[in-house]
Amino acid sequence: MARLKEIYRKEIAPKLKEELQLANVMEVPRVTKITLNMGLGEAVGDKKIIENAVADLEKITGQKPVVTYARKSIAGFKIREGWPIGVKVTLRSDRMYEFLDRLLSISLPRVRDFRGLNAKSFDGRGNYSMGVKEQIIFPEIDYDKIDALRGLDITLTTTARTDDEGRALLRAFKFPFRN
């Protein structure tokens, strides 16, 4: 079992149940999935960019990403319907907790000029989104073998009903929020 999953079950869930005054353990907010998305607008002219992004995300997550395609043509962005424009991967269960553990303990401390995560990046329903400017903060990526620095979006989907519940959950996981 993943380390964070065990910590959640034994320490975080009982503490949150008391803190949020919930009647049942199943009401306690939990992280259901983590979605990593890499938007690649520059991939329009070059297939190699998509292949490299897929390889990077696969190294980071240990799971094969899905290529996303444009749903409709937009002349302003010079894209046509059906062209590949990004890659995404959804992590659940043990892989999700292992990724979250690596993100909090290894990757975020490696971010340059890191002052904490924005505590206002909740969507109103307890889900949290954050952006990473460079994929090299992950130790799985070899700096010498990358072709370009690419950012990615990380979304944590939770069962929390409000932002305050979601914030309490992530604080219990020791997320480094800015004050």
Curated annotation (Swiss-Prot):
Domain of life: Bacteria
Family listed: Belongs to the universal ribosomal protein uL5 family.
Gene encoding the protein: rplE
Subunit architecture: Part of the 50S ribosomal subunit; part of the 5S rRNA/L5/L18/L25 subcomplex. Contacts the 5S rRNA and the P site tRNA. Forms a bridge to the 30S subunit in the 70S ribosome.
Pfam family of the protein (one): Ribosomal_L5_C
Keyword Ribosomal protein recorded: yes
Lineage: Bacteria, Pseudomonadati, Pseudomonadota, Gammaproteobacteria, Pseudomonadales
Name of the protein in its database record: Large ribosomal subunit protein uL5
Disulfide-linked positions: none
Assigned keywords, A-Z: Ribonucleoprotein, Ribosomal protein, RNA-binding, rRNA-binding, tRNA-binding
Keyword rRNA-binding on entry: yes
Entry function: This is one of the proteins that bind and probably mediate the attachment of the 5S RNA into the large ribosomal subunit, where it forms part of the central protuberance. In the 70S ribosome it contacts protein S13 of the 30S subunit (bridge B1b), connecting the 2 subunits; this bridge is implicated in subunit movement. Contacts the P site tRNA; the 5S rRNA and some of its associated proteins might help stabilize positioning of ribosome-bound tRNAs.
Residues spanning the membrane: none
Any GO BP annotation: translation
